[in-house]
C-alpha cells in the first residue's frame, strides 16, 4: 500500500537538503514515512526553516545515536516531541515515552510544525485560523485501543491497509476542529474527542480518516486518474450545484471514504461483532452514509474528468456503494437523522431514535440482514 514514489521523493529532498543527515539515517520503511519529515518540506515552501529542525525531527532514526538536540522542537506547552525518542521539557528531561497501540502512535504533545493545520472550519469557510485546543489522549486511550482491536480482529484486510498508511494520531478537545488528514502531514490522523466519544465514534473515524491517508497513496500520481486538475477544479463550476464548495479531488475522497465505511460496517454486522448501544450506533452511522452518497460526482461527464483508470476506479466504487446501500435500504425509513449537522453524534441520534425501541426490534430479529 505504501507508494514508493513518495519515499523516493523524500529521499531526494533529503539529499538536496542535507547529504550528511541522509547518510546518518536508517533506511527502514518507517524512517521515510515519518509525518513530521513530510510536514517539514511542506512548511519550508512557506518560508525559511532552520535545517536544525530537520535534524531534531530525524535524530530518532539515526543509525548511531548522538547527543540530543531539541532547541527548535518546543511547542506552546514547552514540551519537545522527538519522533522515535520521546517528550522532553525545558530541562531536557524525558517527561513522556512514545506510546503505540496496535502500531499506531498516540501523539501526546503536538510538534510546532503541525500547529498550522488545526483550524476551525465550517461548510467551506475557515471560521478560526488559530483555535485553542489541548491534548486529551489520556481520557480516550482505552476506547481507542478497543476500536483498533475491533477493527483488527473483525476487518483484518482493512486493518492491514490502515496500518500501512496511518502512523500517528493526535486527539484533542475542540469539536470545531473537524477531524481530518492532510497529504502535507501524510500518515497523521487528527481527531477531536468530546466526553461523549464512544467506541463506534473511534471506529468510524479510524475507518473514515484512515481511508483518506490510504487514498493519498493510491492516487499520489493524480495524472493516472484525472484528465483535469482535480484539486483545483471546484465542483459547483461543473455541476452547477451552488452549495458545492468542494474540489473534485476532495469529492472523490468523499466517495472512497463512504465506500470504506459501508464496506466495514457491513462486515461488522454480518459478523455480529457489536450489540446493545454499540450496534444501535453502528446502524445509525450506516444509515448516515446514505445522504453522503451521490452528492455530485455522478453529475459529471466521466470521460472529461477521468482517465480510463480513474473512471474504472470511480464506477467500481459507485456500484459497490449502491449495492451495500440497497442491502440496508430499510434503515433509511427506520431512523430519523434530521438533527444531524456535519458529524453524526450518538447522543443527538438517541434523542430521535429510541434505544429501548431498538432493543425490542433487535430481539425480534428486525435488524438481521
Which residues are covered by each model-predicted region?
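Type-3 copper protein
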Residues: 1-169, 284-369
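Short, flexible helix-coil linker/hinge segments at the edges of structured domains or between repeats
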Residues: 110, 114-131, 175-180, 186, ...
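Short, charged/polar micro-motifs that form catalytic or ligand-binding hotspots
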Residues: 130-141, 192-205, 240-254
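Extended, composition-driven regions rather than compact fold-specific motifs
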Residues: 131, 184, 255-260, 362
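Active-site-proximal segments of catalytic enzyme domains
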Residues: 145-148, 163-192, 202-203
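Metalloprotease/metallohydrolase-associated module, dominated by Zn2+-dependent proteases
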Residues: 161-168, 172-181, 234-307
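Post-HEXXH active-site segment of zinc metalloproteases
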Residues: 182, 196-205, 216-244
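Short active-site segment of divalent metal-dependent hydrolases/proteases
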Residues: 207, 211
